[in-house]
């Protein structure tokens, strides 16, 4: 799911006061409060690393009696620079080796805690109810799919073709055991978990005129994820035209980053980066603003990423999936409520 507006909007003052105000009323306020606490805790953790994130000085919750501001807020450092737009001097698209060294964490290893995936503040700006903690990557991925299927069944997602969309997420759910398995059981990092910024597009990066990374902002929906997601192909290194046109493959940017990691001696991370784009497709999913014909191209890309023939007859596939899941009560309710769809 892409580019849905968040249920909260952040505004920056010249003094670094970030105000979080709901676009909707009722229960959203408690979720806003959760995001405030989550972002503040994340920023305080990042202060112990070399990640160029804003320093956080204070936060307040709207309902607290000692909050004199009146709204939920975080008081943080204002970062210099401008938002990276994937372009720059001499056509420079990607950060070079010096950029990566400047922004490098002292060691790309896991959080100093026992191996669980913590509560998720959000998944792609849609579901703000905290999920987790999870004991395994499999549980984490399953929660993501289940939340989407619940929203489809409720009529909140893909109302024009809910049955087809639900079947796609059932397909993704069937692939989770493969996603959760590690490429090499001897690689320590593949069974540990890492803080990951929710935005893969790159506009959270602040750069100077030479495109040196000077800051990373907007941490309010950061989450803790398995290594394959943290260090695998993301939207920063994707070719979006391929994604929207049903083409699945690693890009030159995926391979370029893998080569850089290998050159720096991070062979395990390089292996994750150049493995495949399954997780990129898994979390990208479908686009809520697309027509059925456009969505079908995304589905074909998902099929290709997971080893299916992208030119599979979609009607035959749908019939097979319906037969396999005829005892899925939620699916049957969707058909009864919305019809079988295209």
Model-identified regions with their sequence ranges:
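ATP-binding pocket architecture of kinase catalytic cores
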Residues: 2-166, 170, 175, 181-195, ...
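Short beta-strand-initiation
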Residues: 7, 200-201
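Intrinsically disordered, low-complexity intracellular terminal segments
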Residues: 82, 107-195, 201, 208, ...
């Amino acid at each position: 799911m892409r580019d849905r507006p968040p249920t909260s909007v952040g505004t920056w003052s010249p003094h670094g006061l970030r105000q979080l105000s709901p676009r909707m009323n009722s229960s959203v306020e408690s979720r806003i409060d959760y995001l405030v606490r989550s972002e503040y805790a994340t920023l305080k953790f990042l202060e112990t690393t070399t990640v160029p994130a804003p320093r956080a000085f204070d936060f307040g919750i709207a309902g607290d009696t000692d909050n004199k501001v009146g709204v939920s807020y975080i008081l943080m450092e204002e970062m210099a620079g401008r938002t990276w737009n994937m372009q720059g001097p001499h056509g420079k698209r990607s950060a070079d080796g010096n950029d990566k060294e400047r922004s490098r964490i002292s060691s790309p290893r896991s959080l100093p805690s026992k191996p669980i995936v913590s509560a998720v503040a959000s998944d792609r700006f849609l579901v703000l109810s905290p999920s987790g903690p999870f004991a395994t990557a499999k549980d984490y991925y399953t929660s993501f799919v289940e939340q989407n299927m619940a929203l489809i069944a409720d009529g909140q997602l893909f109302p024009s073709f809910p049955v087809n969309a639900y079947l796609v997420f059932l397909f993704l759910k069937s692939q989770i055991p493969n996603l959760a398995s590690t490429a090499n059981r001897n690689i320590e990092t593949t069974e540990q978990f890492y803080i990951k910024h929710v935005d893969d597009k790159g506009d959270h990066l602040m750069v100077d005129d030479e495109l040196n990374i000077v800051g990373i902002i907007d941490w309010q929906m950061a989450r803790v994820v398995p290594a394959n997601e943290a260090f695998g192909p993301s939207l920063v290194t994707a070719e979006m035209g391929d994604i929207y046109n049903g083409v699945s493959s690693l890009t030159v940017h995926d391979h370029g980053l893998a080569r850089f990691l290998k050159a720096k001696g991070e062979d395990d991370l390089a292996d994750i980066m150049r493995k495949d784009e399954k997780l990129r497709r898994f979390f990208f999913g479908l686009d809520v603003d697309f027509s059925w014909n456009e969505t079908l191209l995304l589905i074909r890309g998902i099929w290709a990423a997971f080893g299916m023939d992208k030119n599979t007859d979609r009607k035959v596939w749908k019939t097979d999936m319906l037969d396999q899941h005829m005892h899925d009560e939620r699916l049957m309710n969707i058909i009864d409520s919305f019809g079988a769809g295209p």
